[in-house]
Amino acid sequence: MKVKARTFSGTTSNEVTQREIANRALARKAATEGFVLLKNEGHFLPAPKGGKIALYGAGAVKTIKGGTGSGDVNERDYVTIAQGMKNAGYEVTTEGWLDSYVKVYDQAREDWKAAILKKAEKMESPNAFFEAYSSTPFFMPCGEKIDVDAAKADGADTAVFVMARIAGENKDRFDKEGDYFISEEERVLLAQVCESYKDVVLVINTGGLMDLAFADAFDNIRSIVQYVQAGQEGGNAFADVFTGAVTPSGKMTDTWAKTYNDYPGAEVYSYKSGDLTKERYEEGIFVGYRYFDTFLVPVRYGFGYGMSYTDFVITAGKVSVSNPGTMDPKVSVEVTVKNTGDTYAGKEVVQIYVSCPQGELVKEFRRLAGFGKTKLLAPGEEQHMTITFPLYQLASYSEDQAAWILEPGKYGIWVGNELNTSVLSGALELDQEAVMVQCENICPLKEELKEIMPFAKKVQARELAWHEELKAKGIVPVAVKAADIPTEKVDYQKIPEVLPGRAGEIVEQMSEEQLVQMATGDPGKDQGNALGSAGISVPGSAAETPLVAAEEPWNVASIALADGPAGLRLKKEYQVENGRIVPTDFLSALEGGFFAASKEKRGTSYYQYCTAIPVGTLLAQTWNLDLVRELGEMIGHEMELFGITLWLAPGMNIHRNPLCGRNFEYYSEDPLLAGMMAASMTLGVQKVPGCGTTIKHYACNNQEDNRMGSDSILSERTLREIYLKGFEIAIKDAQPMSIMTSYNLINGVHAANCYDTCTRAARDEWGFAGAIMTDWTTTNVQIQGECTAAGCMRAGNDMVMPGMEEDHENIRKELKEGTLDIRELKRCIYNTVNIILQSNQYEEAVSYENQFDGLGEWLTVK
């Protein structure tokens, strides 16, 4: 195999390329499909094109395109909502207010910068700056009050008010004014806007949810748009939806509660419990809509909710079960969707929920089992769809049996365009219990945990009610026989005596020291151990694998890894002098170089402009798997262009609580939706030869405060059904090249050192074939317990990132003492080398997905 010759990444030309233009157009399309229209009183939107418009709020001119930290992208430029409205032909009447806001904002940013630098000086951590930065969130200033009389006379009837919030890794949000709640200054400003203009459109430019009770007090807020954070083309995309050039089709991927305290465990989440060392998952499986729907708690906007400019009628048809007697029985639901409006074309999302029988295992009232998005339907046009999903999607986990089981009884099938209004449309009936997968128990609890449960009588009454509804509708359940459902028995593997293939040959030829070096990344002598910018050959990349086996007979290339998940995070400009890259520090790669000291440029400049796509939550709100797959392929081609092999994305943890600082990176409160989005993104990226994704953060990364020392305490059933399920789906449906473990502990064991999740679940149960890596500095910053590099090797966590000499010392020490078996080390290096040999660093690279059968078939729509 021939390793590609290394060249400097990017281009010496600063001209906008056709690649940038095309990719921005796709990012814009994705944003338009992800915006959720929450309110549209009197069909106020779409608004007439052109004319005068008033813009207020922090996000109008300082629109937040994405979150902070490793999820940020250093794009060429981005379009604010204000610029997008101007591009659409509107005359903005509030230029004076916007200009004054920019000055207020810029000063606030400088003050924030100074506070962080001062805080970092007092810290002794090797990652002092990043810790100071990520633990000191920037709160958007409100802006000045307005002159009501002047505003009334500015000629605009409509005002757009953009609420904005910033969040990022290492710090959870606050349930206080100015964050989850509207600040008093914002309330006063909004009241002035509502007094000054006839009609107001409220835009929510946040990475997560916020309390919207304030909106009820203003009668002339006609429309509310959930904008989230829409990437670099967000402003243009908003104008597309505002004017009706695109009909909104986004749907909520979370439940928007009436009040924060309605969320289960709200009062003890993260810092609110007073103990950041333990996070007790007492809500069990009742997360998000599973809680609200089961416990009958009223909500503001339900899971799957979203309005359109047109109307649709969804008619459910035949329900069937296929592939009996195989390991993959399927359920299919036929649906017809018709656009019954007379003006606007639009897309609709069909959602299928299932009520599983309440037997020995108490279950949620309904769970998402399948979904599909229509094509663009003209007025009067209809589309016939068959949505097919695995029967396994309806299985529940029994800890007593250590098995995924289907309990006997009726399985009600609900069809609609959101959870709360879905209609009981069909059913299955299983004659007796079926064991679908026989496993072994993993991640046992080490202390007592009492989970909430619904009242048994209410559960039984609701189940009886929908059984009676089936009879009243004349629906005859489709009979399913347990005898037609074979049991898959997991074969838990031992380390093979002989490692297979070319990768095995190479590993067996390596010296012990080469193996030790290959167990970590190579941070680079010039870059230090900076979080997220330890790459050498591709400036701004997160890390590289070492070159200790680059010569014959091994010929193992070094691969570069880049952060995400809203696009590739690289330095958009770097310099080359005398044939060498001029070294820069971490600050130059953060927030577009905002924190870096000004330096004179030396040598020739190279440019790496990557596309900033919408954040994960907004992508999931599209409910469009084909579109996400197309975005993945786009990112794969950018990886190919800049020499990146592994994209450290997608992020796919569950939205357990709206205050999690990193929710913007993740998709949903539902594991099926999260898993399918990650699978689709992976299938797109990995279509490009030698490129791969890194699904993260595995697992239970549901809070950011004390993320390296927090112990997620939860039952095995909750772990498997909610927090591992999305990863399971992504692996089985897309086979990502790699997985990144999380910082936290799971029932007392560090995720990076957890054999149960890294090996028994991912590899033995789900068939994962790629490499696993730690998150950055997992083994170097200890808060609770000890997480070691040797512990990673024992667990089957193959790459310690970004790689430090102390990691090598730890591995050498444990090999010498016999607490680490050389075969355990070789197994990990084999997994890494196996991926490297299939990377885009070789001339002969092909699509990684080619070697697997049955990918992309978990959920199909025809």
Can you say where each PLM-predicted feature lies in the sequence?
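Glycoside hydrolase catalytic-domain context in secreted enzymes
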Residues: 1-396, 405-419, 438-862
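Extracellular/periplasmic metallocenter environments
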Residues: 402
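Short beta-strand elements
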Residues: 421-438
